[in-house]
Amino acid sequence: MFARLCPVSETFGRLCPVSETFARLCPVSETFARLCPVSETFARLCPVSETFGRLCPVSEMFGRLSPVSETFGRLCPVSETFGRLCPVSEMFARLCPVSETFGRLSPVSEMFGRLCPVSEMFGRLCPVSEMFGRLCPVIT
């Protein structure tokens, strides 16, 4: 599903078994890595409109990461990890029926959770919290 958006072997790619799914988000090393100005990073995940975008009308939501303050945030108690990606505390959350896949990030161990030692990969992108927290100077 999230699979081969392109090659992010430098950032998202090393999420362990995720290296085959989230891994290829394009040159995300330049996009996802800079989740500060997310409006310019996550939004340009390539033709994400065909993969990431179709999480629902996510193509309209995920694509508009400018007002990220309405999506990334409420993934459950993710508000402490994924949620603090800036004012992202309200964006990632409403991916529609995504509440069944991405939305259950509480037991992340079922979906996004198996990023393995995410604390070593996803977590060290800057200091967002403890897991997704360090995505650059993403002012928490």
Swiss-Prot record:
Keyword vocabulary terms for this entry: Repeat
Keyword Repeat: yes
Highest rank taxon of the organism: Eukaryota
Region annotated 14 X 10 AA tandem repeats of [MT]-F-[AG]-R-L-[CS]-P-V-[SI]-[ET], chain positions: 1-140
Sequence repeat boundaries on the chain: 1-10, 11-20, 21-30, 31-40, 41-50, 51-60, 61-70, 71-80, 81-90, 91-100, 101-110, 111-120, 121-130, 131-140
Keyword Signal belongs to the record: no
Protein known as: Putative uncharacterized protein FLJ45035
Organism: Homo sapiens
